[in-house]
A protein has these predicted regions:
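Hydrophobic transmembrane alpha-helices and their immediate loop junctions
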Residues: 2-267
Length: 267
């Protein structure tokens, strides 16, 4: 049984990902779309961390399912960090590139991890744990990226010869803070097939919960519509605010080269 997982990242002009220039400017909350930028510079910063984040999200679902008694993902070879096993040509590559080229919100996802909830030792508990595992992983990655920004900033300052490598890693980690918090909050949307729907259904009366889970393809349409309405910005605001809070605390460790990298990519 396969569960469709969709990951989202909306990139903004004054995004929380943006570094303060020369370590003096405060980080602003996102309010508008990312300006058109050279594709190569943007992909250098976005693609590695986005790919790793959505793969980690799916891996977490499969691993949590294994711990709850479902060995489906393990038997099919999906409990691996090999990106080739998780990449979906359409959702992971072509669709994000097409949306980026059209200056639209970027929708991307990894190949869904196969899961059979009927194998859970406790269906309800297992379903909730597996559904929240991906979200928890993205939050953990955001915190890990925060640590990477701090470490690379310290090393880059103390060892000038390493500042080039450190600035690239720091820029990707900086983007990763906001990106992973957005992925976590987006997947909490209570719209099937997103993770939040697997929690909300247990708060509804049984008859209503069954109809709610049968939304199917209409749920994807609802999500796509939300992406083009102000409602999604309100829903994602906790992610924006959290990213801004974390990044503001890191301003003193930002390398000048990092600021230049993000400026070139128009973050």
């Amino acid at each position: 049984m396969s569960r469709r997982r969709i990951a989202l990242t909306r990139l903004f002009r004054r995004a929380s990902f943006r570094l303060p220039q020369a370590r003096r400017r405060a980080v602003a909350l996102p309010v508008s779309y990312l300006r058109p930028a050279p594709l190569a510079q943007s992909l250098l910063l976005i693609a590695p961390i986005l790919l790793f984040s959505i793969i980690a999200h799916e891996y977490a679902h499969g691993y949590a399912a294994l711990k709850q008694g479902d060995t489906t993902a393990s038997k099919l070879g999906r409990l691996t960090w090999n990106p080739i096993k998780h990449i979906d040509p359409w959702m992971s590559i072509f669709l994000p590139l097409m949306l980026y080229a059209a200056h639209l919100p970027i929708l991307a996802g990894a190949k869904p991890v196969p899961i059979n909830p009927s194998n859970y030792r406790n269906y309800k508990r297992g379903d909730i744990i597996v559904s929240l595992a991906g979200i928890a992983t993205n939050v953990a990655l955001a915190l890990a990226c925060t640590i990477v920004v701090a470490i690379t900033g310290f090393i880059g300052e103390e060892i000038p010869a390493a500042s080039g490598v450190c600035s690239v890693l720091q820029a990707m980690a900086w983007v990763g803070i906001g990106l992973n918090l957005i992925l976590a909050m987006f997947n909490l949307l209570p719209v099937p097939p997103l993770d939040g729907s697997h929690v909300l259904k247990y708060l509804l009366p049984p008859a209503l919960a069954q109809r709610y889970q049968q939304i199917g393809f209409a749920g994807i349409v609802i999500v796509l519509i939300l992406l083009y309405t102000p409602a999604i910005s309100y829903w994602l605001f906790p992610a924006y605010a959290s990213a801004s809070l974390l990044q503001n605390g890191l301003r003193s460790l930002v390398l000048p080269e990092t600021s230049q990298l993000l400026s070139a990519a128009r973050f």
